[in-house]
Amino acid sequence: MDAASRPAVVIDNGTGYTKMGFAGNVEPCFITPTVVAVNDTFAGQTRANTTKGNWMAQHSAGVMADLDFFIGEDALARSRSSNTYNLSYPIHNGQVENWDTMERFWQQCIFNYLRCDPEDHYFLLTESPLTPPETREYTGEIMFETFNVPGLYIACQPVLALAAGYTTTKCEMTGVVVDVGDGATHIVPVADGYVIGSSIRSIPITGKDVTQFIQQLLKERGEHIPPEESFDVARRVKEMYCYTCSDIVKEFNKHDREPNKYIKHWSGIKPKTGAKYTCDIGYERFLGPEIFFHPEIYNNDFTTPLHVVIDKCIQSSPIDTRRALYKNIVLSGGSTMFKDFHRRLQRDLKKIVDARVLASNARLGGDAKAQPIEVNVVSHPIQRYAVWFGGSVLASTAEFYEACHTKAEYEEYGASICRTNPVFKGMY
């Protein structure tokens, strides 16, 4: 059976989580933390045997070290239950930093999770914007040399998110993608499927920062949460209880007037003693997401709100694309799922745009009148997995297999072919 007749494998590697599955599905088959636990016992034996000159023992220890590792939730569980396993995070701020660990991670994803033969499927992998071309070469080498895949396409995450966020029968591949990940936040303008690289903006406020801010607030308030559980509790509070408010002062007053209505209660069990503990969740519910709109409450070194960064991103784009960009601002990532996040972002951004139009009309003095600009922030139910879903849809088209780099091309031209990946018009 030809590999092109089988569904392609779609893997979206993020800093915090990896989404994996097969093209044509609505949701990924597996979502797992991007982390690897490696047994340091065998690594220590390898070093000791090298010193003693015992090469056979060194080889055996090296083989065991290559086999004894876990990924995802299994890795986190192993690190908690045993001191011999150390955690390694291969991706930092959206970029791969440890290729050996990344290869191990992919190995487990393909064989233990998806349980497929990589030689029988084309692969679509994702990358963050501004990824250097050398990274694509390393990815191509691993995929073609180690896993012997028949075809590979490396897609830019914002383009896939834009493909997932279309709201009409025609997929508009012009828009701005606000991608808030666990380790990186990018604002990326895209015109006709091509990223406008010179206008990309990044901010040092991510989903992990929201979690850490909630963790900090709970600690300062004196809630009795076990230290080893505090980050995980803060993450769950973020996902379950947080929302975006329209006015932070009014929200404080509402909580003070009716605490029983707005305060939530969290209960858990201490892992060491088994005793129960409880804590109250109050201001943290709206203060967590607020750092995107008032970052100074969390980080004194960065004080530019998200909507201002988006406006600067669009204003630095070619003038003939700006109206289309304002009209299609697509959210992507789990930390954009807060209730009313898209409404708050659209309101604050529209204030800036309307003020600019009024100032332009005042300068013209009535001789001409600037046309109003439509601002639209797109929110949809699958924006948490928007990048993966966009990859799933695009990898389901016939054009995908034509755009992939094949193993034969890799053997003829080398890894340099992976430096560029053509934009294909599969949906528009």
Curated annotation (Swiss-Prot):
Molecular function GO terms recorded: actin binding; ATP binding
PANTHER family: ACTIN (PTHR11937)
Protein keywords: Actin-binding, ATP-binding, Cytoplasm, Cytoskeleton, Developmental protein, Nucleotide-binding
Listed CDD domains: ASKHA_NBD_Arp3-like
Family assignment from sequence similarity: Belongs to the actin family. ARP3 subfamily.
InterPro entries in the record: Actin, ATPase_NBD
Biological function: Functions as ATP-binding component of the Arp2/3 complex which is involved in regulation of actin polymerization and together with an activating nucleation-promoting factor (NPF) mediates the formation of branched actin networks. Seems to contact the pointed end of the daughter actin filament. Regulates the directionality of cell expansion by regulating the actin organization, and thus the microtubules distribution and the fusion of small vacuoles.
Matching Pfam families: Actin
SMART domains xrefs: ACTIN (SM00268)
Cellular component, GO annotation: Arp2/3 protein complex; cytoplasm
Subunit field text: Component of the Arp2/3 complex.
Keyword Nucleotide-binding attached: yes
Protein name: Actin-related protein 3
A Gene Ontology BP annotation from the UniProt entry: Arp2/3 complex-mediated actin nucleation
Compartment(s): Cytoplasm, Cytoskeleton
